[in-house]
């Protein structure tokens, strides 16, 4: 797996892809405009065409966050894998925090803003576990898991904090999607 155990800072979009897994360890601090971390494959052609269609080519690992992931104002944090666990903090101002569990996930972006997402193909035992904190001011929080139809269920468990707040007309929005959602 890819281990982020220290600081990662960037003014632009950071994309981390490792089919063996991505781990943000306790004490990790990420400060970026936008972050996409995935254990699903993104082809070179799709990347060059700014098409973020991630697909499991077999044996995709999981994502674990025990650190602090923060996107600058208007940015995005997207974690894409069959199994995602957040025990740390994810924070975005005026943007999107999204955890997407499936075998094929497509993110449509306008700059660094998420404008649409689809889980095109479910996975066996899709799981999103949030025991940490996801904080979005004036933006969107999405936790979406999709299992293989008729074979398994997808699970979204959140024992942690999810907050989407805003002082504008739109305010904040939280979307929890899955066959089994536990708050």
Give the positions of each predicted feature.
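Extracellular and secretory-pathway beta-repeat/beta-biased strand scaffolds
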Residues: 1-183
């Amino acid at each position: 797996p890819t281990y982020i155990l220290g600081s990662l800072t960037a003014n632009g979009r950071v994309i981390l892809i490792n089919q063996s897994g991505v781990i943000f360890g306790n004490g990790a601090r990420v400060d970026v405009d936008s972050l996409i971390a995935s254990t699903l494959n993104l082809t070179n052609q799709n990347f060059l065409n700014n098409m973020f269609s991630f697909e499991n080519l077999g044996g995709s690992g999981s994502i674990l966050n025990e650190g602090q992931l923060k996107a600058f104002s208007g940015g995005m944090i997207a974690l894409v894998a069959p199994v995602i666990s957040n025990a740390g903090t994810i924070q975005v101002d005026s943007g999107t925090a999204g955890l997407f569990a499936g075998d094929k996930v497509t993110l449509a972006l306008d700059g660094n803003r998420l404008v649409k997402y689809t889980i095109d193909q479910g996975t066996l035992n899709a799981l999103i576990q949030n025991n940490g904190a996801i904080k979005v001011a004036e933006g969107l929080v999405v936790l979406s898991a999709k299992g293989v139809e008729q074979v398994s269920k997808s699970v979204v468990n959140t024992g942690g904090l999810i907050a989407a707040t805003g002082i504008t007309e739109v305010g904040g929005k939280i979307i929890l999607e899955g066959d089994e959602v536990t708050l």
